[in-house]
Amino acid sequence: SEYACASGMSFLSTDTKGDVMRNYGTIAKEHYGYQVSVIDLRNPTRSNGNNLLHLVNKYMDLYKENPKELVYKARCEKYAKIISKTIILSGMDAASFGQNAYFYDAAEGLLTATILLVAEFCEPEKRHIVSVFKIIQELLAPSQKKGKNQFQQLMELLPDDHKAKWFAGAALNTAEQSMASVM
């Protein structure tokens, strides 16, 4: 962190305990002029009002207004994928996943698909990461339909060419027990 501060570049630190924020946040702010923000995925009320889905929502809105401008849709999907990868990897190297790589890929796809659905279908005040996690939690509830988990049932409601289905690929073709590991 000290080297990043001294170089003046922007950076992101993962900080599960809050130590980096406590020890370096003040120094970065007071001595190097950094703007320090906290994004707390477990307790969003402790975050600095940063909506992780801002760019996804922005480009989804632009695409809805201009459906022929596929560049907006592509950017929306790109930012959804970046958010998913950032959350799933959380500072780890994907090469270290080994035998579990399938589950991480499926989780990333499921998260990307859910982010896109929230950006497309939720009311503006509900289009944030907390809604994404709430929906995923709700999808963990037992299914009434044998052989189909709730996520698969949700995806069945979408048109065949919907991009969320494409991102969710691996998660859609997994057994119910494996799906619990993905989620």
Regions found by a protein language model. Give the residues of each.
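Non-catalytic, charge-rich alpha-helical accessory subdomains
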Residues: 94-183
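Switch/coupling segment of Walker-type NTPase motor domains
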Residues: 2-109
